[in-house]
């Protein structure tokens, strides 16, 4: 199995990418990795070249670049070359912690869209209080959506949750303003009706306040709603941890309490740590394309590689394609 990685994408590249790649190579004997980027910088952190190849390029896509224009003009950028490796059949999948918009453009224009899928979806795995997490899609690939798009998101998310996350008969929920049937705008109502007849375990409408409780294994929404929900959850979690830290450090007594509670607090922190959940998959493309978090450390990169390997090994893309062929809904 071969995975191409944009070694120059992310806040801590290439160090985090190289260290994460070496960790993955040690863990998985069937894995070969191509690191795409500036060879001189990559070699500063590469202590073992076992099953690791470097594809040198001086060009990269910056966070300030306009995504589509950058992908079309910077043909030798590390992200574009990683995607090209997939298109050419040299790699089975690609990963980048660089610009989300640019990676979506590279996925569409270079890797290509899966036949029958109208719009790709960006899908991270979000944490829950029980540590199991849930898949949410779309969180920003498309801010506007039609009912058919959300129907396809539900099917793709269900296949992923079962194949990669090992959840038998995953629960699929539609993010809405209430749990009752008939709630929401016209889009939500149409999608609800369609999902009731879909080849998935549809559990109905779910509310954002229940997401972290694990009310569903897959949560479906349009990209605008998903992005707002995602950032609200992230912001709330950061604010709560900040307030908790402030209170625990406010007096000598509370500091003693903090020392006693530290092991439990670390468990809680680990449950909410994005670095353990891998990256956000771009569903609807011809091959796995994974967007790692922009601030990924080496553990985050390793988790994204593990996730990508599972997608390839469990044949997620062919399975989605097969299911969609059996359920042509236009």
From Swiss-Prot:
Subunit structure: Homodimer. Probably interacts with PlsY.
InterPro entries in UniProt: FA_synthesis, Phospholipid_synth_PlsX-like
EC numbers for this chain: 2.3.1.274
Protein task: Catalyzes the reversible formation of acyl-phosphate (acyl-PO(4)) from acyl-[acyl-carrier-protein] (acyl-ACP). This enzyme utilizes acyl-ACP as fatty acyl donor, but not acyl-CoA.
HAMAP family documented for this protein: PlsX (MF_00019)
GO terms for biological process, alphabetical: fatty acid biosynthetic process; phospholipid biosynthetic process
Recorded catalytic activity of this chain's protein: a fatty acyl-[ACP] + phosphate = an acyl phosphate + holo-[ACP]
Pfam families in the cross-refs: FA_synthesis
Keywords assigned: Cytoplasm, Lipid biosynthesis, Lipid metabolism, Phospholipid biosynthesis, Phospholipid metabolism, Transferase
Cellular component aspect of the GO annotation: cytoplasm
Family: Belongs to the PlsX family.
Entry-linked Gene3D superfamilies: Isopropylmalate Dehydrogenase
Pathways per UniProt: Lipid metabolism; phospholipid metabolism
Species this protein is from: Bacillus cereus (strain AH820)
Subcellular location(s) per record: Cytoplasm
Broad class of enzyme this protein falls into: transferase
SUPFAM superfamilies linked: Isocitrate/Isopropylmalate dehydrogenase-like (SSF53659)
GO terms for MF: phosphate:acyl-[acyl carrier protein] acyltransferase activity
Endoplasmic reticulum is among the record's keywords: no
Organism domain of life: Bacteria
Entry keyword Lipid biosynthesis: yes
Protein name stated in the entry: Phosphate acyltransferase
